[in-house]
Design a protein with these regions (language model features):
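Conserved, mostly hydrophobic/aromatic
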Residues: 8, 39, 47, 92, ...
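Conserved anion-binding
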Residues: 12-15, 19-23, 90, 97-171
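Glycine-rich, proline-tolerant flexible connector loops at the mouths of alpha/beta enzymes
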Residues: 46-62, 104, 164-175
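Conserved beta-strand positions in the central sheet of alpha/beta enzyme cores
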Residues: 48-51, 78, 101-102, 125, ...
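Glycine/small-residue-rich loop that forms an oxyanion/phosphate-binding "nest" at active or ligand-binding sites
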Residues: 53, 61-118
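Charged helix-capping and loop-helix junction motifs
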Residues: 60-67, 141-150, 175-184
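Catalytic cores of alpha/beta
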Residues: 73, 77-96, 180-182, 186-215
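C-terminal helical cap(s) of enzyme catalytic domains, especially alpha/beta-barrels
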Residues: 112-119, 209, 213-218, 222-236
Length: 236
């Protein structure tokens, strides 16, 4: 299992949100590049980077900074947030991003998703972000009418290989991921599953590993030092 430290970017700064609430953002460091270099030094497997402004606005707001992270670090980087056109997907892949995460566009634009998978295959992942069991869009601000298991099965049928799975109510809480949701997903689809949201400590990392997940994302736990990234990597 891989462990992906998270860098969420809002107005050019690394921040953490609480339950996806932009009004409850907290700056966790002064410099995005310094965060990325620190995670590289600690031998992270992968970086998970989100353009929060982009997710809200539907465009590449922090793209230049993200590209700088990709060029500066020797780690594979996955990027999400506001990627809703093939031009945006092309831009990130051409600038060295290893995996592009589609969220809103995966729900609203089947044609784009299918074309992206045809062109880039496993370099395309989908963010399964849900609240009360239903998938959310537009930076988690809007709830759809699609149940998360139905969405996951639809994504698998289209050819999606990797799902980043977040229960929004768990995000930033340090209360643990929604293991019931993750287990249900594991039982219903064969996609690679990455858990996100709520991770606090090594016990949560171990439980994700025991479930047979492909990966787990940790953000607030690392910044608030309830989880040591090196120790997490060691047990995986």
């Amino acid at each position: 299992m891989i462990v992906l430290p998270a860098i969420d970017i809002l107005d050019g700064k690394p921040v953490r949100l609480y339950q996806g609430d932009y009004g409850q953002s907290k700056c966790v460091a002064e410099d995005v590049l310094a965060c990325a270099k620190k995670f590289e030094k600690e031998k992270a497997n992968y970086l998970h980077v989100v353009d929060l402004n982009g997710a809200k606005e539907g465009s590449r707001i922090n793209a230049d900074l993200i590209c700088e992270v990709v060029k500066t670090c020797q780690l594979p980087v996955e990027v999400g947030g506001g990627i809703r056109t093939m031009e945006a997907i092309d831009f990130y892949i051409e600038n060295g991003v290893s995996r592009v995460i589609l969220g809103t566009s995966a729900i609203q634009d089947d044609c784009l998703l299918k074309d992206a998978i045809k062109k880039y295959g496993s370099k395309i992942a989908v963010g399964l972000d849900c609240k009360d069991g239903y998938v959310c869009t537009s930076g988690w601000l809007e709830k759809s009418k699609e149940y998360y298991l139905d969405f996951a099965k639809r994504m698998e049928k289209i050819g999606v290989k990797t799902l980043i799975c977040t229960d929004i109510s768990k995000d930033g809480t340090l209360q643990g991921p929604n293991f019931e949701m993750l287990e249900a997903l594991k039982n219903h689809v064969s996609c690679n599953l990455i858990a996100s949201g709520g991770v606090r400590d090594l016990s949560h990392i171990q439980k994700c590993k025991d479930l047979g997940l492909y990966g787990v994302i940790a953000g607030k736990a690392i910044y608030e030092k309830t989880l040591d990234l090196k120790e997490a990597l060691n047990i995986c």
